[in-house]
């Protein structure tokens, strides 16, 4: 979570909008993020990274409904119209991306080949919770790898905070506009922040 916050904050400081939506993404399904703090006494919300908002850039984080296809479709369109922003959609559990498979198949994996549309959207898919029960343990990495063709998208599995930090920053700074599918072992991605500079 620290590497993620550092990546977001550094992009905001460089005048890039950062946007994330998904079920329970403000807190993080596994209580790893805490991007939005809730005051227990009065119910008010505090989002520390909003302090870095200036000019036309903004940090926006939205808890969305369990309507994966519609939310991912909206975020895909937002990313298409905001090519300099870091736009992310997080599945509460990686399996929940099943509900958005049509968006992945028709747009994320194929829009560049079909319509010459380039997009930098990031899919954050928690992965690897063996024993967590059906529909809660696998982001189906093989499904995304099977969709890879002609450099249409990037599929990564960062194993250190530094790798995740650099992947998010690279998504905004690289000249190539490709969707990024990021399979995250949230509970195991804890380490020193070496390499985050």
Model-identified regions with their sequence ranges:
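Non-catalytic terminal/interface segments that mediate subunit docking, oligomerization
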Residues: 1-84, 89-112
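Conserved small/polar residues in nucleotide/adenosyl-binding loops
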Residues: 185-192
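Short intrinsically disordered, low-complexity segments
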Residues: 90, 193-194
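Phosphate/diphosphate-binding loops
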Residues: 91-93, 99-101, 105-112, 117-184
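Residue-level marker of positions within ordered structural domains that often coincide
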Residues: 79, 149, 191
């Amino acid at each position: 979570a620290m590497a993620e916050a550092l990546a977001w904050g550094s992009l905001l400081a460089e005048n890039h909008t950062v946007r994330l939506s998904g079920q329970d993404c403000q807190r993080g399904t596994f209580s790893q993020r805490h991007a939005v703090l809730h005051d227990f006494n009065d119910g008010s919300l505090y989002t520390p990274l909003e302090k870095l908002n200036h000019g036309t850039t903004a940090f926006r984080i939205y808890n969305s409904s369990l309507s994966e296809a519609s939310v991912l479709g909206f975020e895909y369109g937002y990313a298409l119209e905001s090519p300099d922003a870091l736009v992310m959609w997080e599945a509460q559990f990686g399996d929940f991306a099943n509900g958005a498979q049509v968006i992945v198949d028709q747009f994320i994996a194929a829009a560049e080949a079909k319509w010459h549309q380039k997009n930098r959207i990031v899919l954050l898919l928690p992965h690897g919770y063996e024993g967590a029960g059906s529909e809660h343990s696998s982001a189906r990495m093989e499904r995304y790898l099977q969709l890879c063709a002609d450099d249409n998208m990037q599929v990564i599995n960062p194993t250190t905070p530094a790798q995740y930090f650099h992947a998010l920053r690279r998504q905004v700074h690289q000249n190539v506009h490709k969707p990024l599918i990021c399979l995250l072992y949230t509970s195991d991605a804890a380490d020193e922040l070496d390499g985050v500079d």
